[in-house]
Regions:
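Intrinsically disordered, low-complexity Ser/Thr-rich linker and spacer segments
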Residues: 1-2, 62-64
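Conserved hydrophobic/aromatic packing and binding residues within compact polymer-binding modules
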Residues: 40-43
Length: 64
């Protein structure tokens, strides 16, 4: 399933931790808020993905 603003849980925490390992400074609380969405957009732009701020299959595969 797609992770987006409003999502919560372990998968969101995993994304936050991965983004932090790449230089972001997110609170890894498992809550997908505006800061996480903005960090995901930066990741997507850096990796040639559609920068929609949501973590779907393509973003997940590139991230992990």
């Amino acid at each position: 399933s797609v992770l987006r603003t409003g999502s919560a849980g372990g998968a969101v925490r995993l994304v936050q931790q991965k983004l932090n390992s790449l230089g972001e400074r997110l609170k890894d609380d498992g809550k997908y808020g505006a800061a996480t969405a903005a960090a995901v957009q930066r990741f997507q732009r850096r990796n040639g993905l559609t920068a929609d701020g949501s973590v779907g299959c393509a973003t997940w595969e590139k991230m992990f």
